[in-house]
Regions:
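Catalytic-core regions of core metabolic enzymes
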Residues: 1-179
Length: 179
């Protein structure tokens, strides 16, 4: 149950913040963007180093090279874990494979979902590290769904005819945490 989340990026960060607010997340949200003063009315930090402490959870939606550096810095801060939404790793070929290895070499103890994934929704604790509008609400029970596919998990999250969900994870490349 994260007390705080750091959100790295621009437009996708805005959506994650909106989704967390919509769900009723009560913890602190720390947007990180060196080019913006605020996102969704919340003051931005310029870098990982400017955060007050290692965040409990993070959402990373920046280009590949900065994503690797962010993961390295979050690991050094003993941050809890996070989602790397960033694509362009091994799914794009040899160059991406090298970058994914570099990501892995820097992840350390940082629990990472992805890269190249939609993220996770925790309906129980009201947190959505997920860059899309989603449906669903937590009625006190529900299934946990883990998929490799972002599109499948997104379709399930917006369906009003299926069973309720407690947790939803799109695992993407599964570089660190795997199915």
């Amino acid at each position: 149950n994260p007390k705080n989340i750091a959100v790295f990026g621009g437009r996708d960060a805005e959506i994650v913040i909106s989704q967390c607010k919509k769900m009723g997340f009560k913890g602190e949200i720390w947007p990180v963007n060196p080019k913006r003063k605020e996102i969704n009315g919340i003051r931005c930090f310029s870098s990982v180093r400017d955060l007050p402490e290692g965040p409990d959870a993070s959402f990373i939606a920046v280009p590949r090279l900065p994503a690797i550096e962010i993961v390295k810095e979050l690991n050094a801060m003993k941050a809890g874990g996070g989602v790397c939404y960033t694509a362009g790793f091994r799914e794009v070929g040899k160059e991406g494979e090298k970058l994914e290895k570099e990501l892995l070499d820097n992840v350390g103890d940082f629990a990472l979902i992805g890269p190249n994934c939609y993220g996770m929704i925790n309906y129980v604790n009201k947190i959505a590290l997920w860059p899309f509008d989603h449906g669903g609400e937590f009625p006190g029970f529900g299934a946990a769904i883990i998929t490799q596919s972002g599109m499948l998990s997104n379709d399930l999250s917006t369906s009003r005819r299926s069973m309720p969900f407690a947790y939803m994870i799109s695992a993407g490349n599964q570089s660190v945490l795997s199915l």
